[in-house]
Design a protein with these regions (language model features):
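An extracytoplasmic/periplasmic, membrane-proximal ligand-sensing/linker region
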Residues: 18-45, 50-57, 61, 230-232, ...
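Short helices/loops that flank or line small-molecule/ion binding pockets
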Residues: 84-98, 111, 141, 185-205
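C-terminal motif of bacterial Sec signal peptides marking the signal peptidase cleavage site
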Residues: 13-16
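Extracytoplasmic small-molecule ligand-binding "clamshell" domains
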Residues: 26-102
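Hinge/capping helix and adjacent helix->loop/strand transition within the periplasmic-binding protein
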Residues: 131-146, 240, 247, 255
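Pocket-lining segment of extracytoplasmic ligand-binding domains
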Residues: 135, 146-244
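Acidic, polar ligand-binding/catalytic clefts
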Residues: 87-142
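Sec-dependent signal peptide recognition
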Residues: 2-8
């Protein structure tokens, strides 16, 4: 039985690590009426909340819903294999609409994007640090000299916030631990499960999904530490998108939690709702990034 579990876990690990491989990126387009010459296609870029395949499974229904309910428009989901690829496209204004993390959201303002909304549930936008229950790790200082896995350097909740927590609790992140950036949330978690790292940084949503879908893996792990929260992932739009389209997208997103179809989509995202936001919503993120840059490592 143990050997079967290891084989299944290793298969899951390979799938989770797929964002770093040179594979075609998932970018399915959905339209309820087919491709018409009069329809305008809008590219919706969602940052690597999950690996591309998982992201496709979670967000494709939302693209189909928007396409079905906005006349003359179709929405194309674009996933990126990793944070670096997503950042490059976001800052080059490839996306018409985007769902970046708060760090990327703040940066996107300087690239011409406008914040119009965000994910709700700010209490869930926090970093968590997982360890194996049999690791023997008791305190932050036990991480000295150990490997800690993260999704990517620019992941706010899953990397920067845990690193700030470690730094402010007595361990120098840049000199006293071995930081490994492994490409995705799932990969970070699997690294600690497979003992490739002593601790794994992520955030609650991937951990909740794993605990539900793979309890055989989750039962070996525990959340040892968690950070304070910050505002959740933002919704931004490029300035050349017609205001009428932005208004309709906003209306549809902000009312998802009121209908059964919307609740089902939000459930896949482990989210209760989308809500309105603007630049002022993310002032606390800007302040955190300033502290992080001074106390942990410089941000590009």
């Amino acid at each position: 039985m143990r050997s079967k579990l290891v084989i299944v876990a290793l298969f899951w690990f390979v799938v989770a690590c797929s964002p770093d491989s040179e594979q075609p990126e998932y970018s399915p387009a959905f339209s309820s009426t087919g491709s018409l010459a009069t329809e305008k296609e809008y590219i919706f870029g969602v940052h690597p909340l999950h690996n591309p395949q998982r992201l496709h499974e979670v967000f494709s229904p939302l693209m189909e819903y928007l396409s079905k309910n906005i006349e003359g428009a179709t929405f194309k989901l674009e996933a990126s294999r990793n944070y670096a690829a997503y950042d490059k496209k976001l800052y080059a204004q490839k996306f018409d609409f985007a769902l970046p993390n708060p760090y990327q959201t703040v940066n996107s303002i300087n690239k011409g994007y406008k914040i119009f909304g965000k994910m709700a549930d700010d209490h869930n936008f926090r970093g968590i640090i997982l360890i194996r229950k049999d690791s023997g790790i008791k305190t932050i200082e036990d991480l000295k000299g150990k490997v800690v896995s993260y999704p990517a350097p620019t992941a706010l909740a899953a990397t920067m916030m845990p690193q700030y927590y470690i730094q402010t609790h007595g361990v120098d992140v840049m000199t006293e631990i071995d930081n490994r950036y492994v490409g995705s949330q799932e990969s970070s978690i699997m690294n600690v499960f497979l003992k490739h790292s002593s601790a794994a940084a992520t955030w609650p949503l991937p951990w909740i999904a794993l605990s539900r879908e793979r309890p055989d893996i989750a039962e070996s792990l525990t959340v040892k530490w968690q950070t304070e929260p910050l505002p959740n992932n933002g919704l931004v739009v490029r300035p050349d998108v017609p205001e009428g389209v932005v208004k309709k997208v906003s209306e549809l997103l902000f009312s998802l939690h009121l209908i059964a179809e919307g609740k089902a989509m939000l459930g896949k995202m482990e989210l209760s709702a989308f809500e309105s936001a603007d630049n002022t919503t993310y002032l606390s993120v800007t302040k955190f990034l300033e502290k992080f840059s001074k106390e942990v490592r410089a941000l590009k």
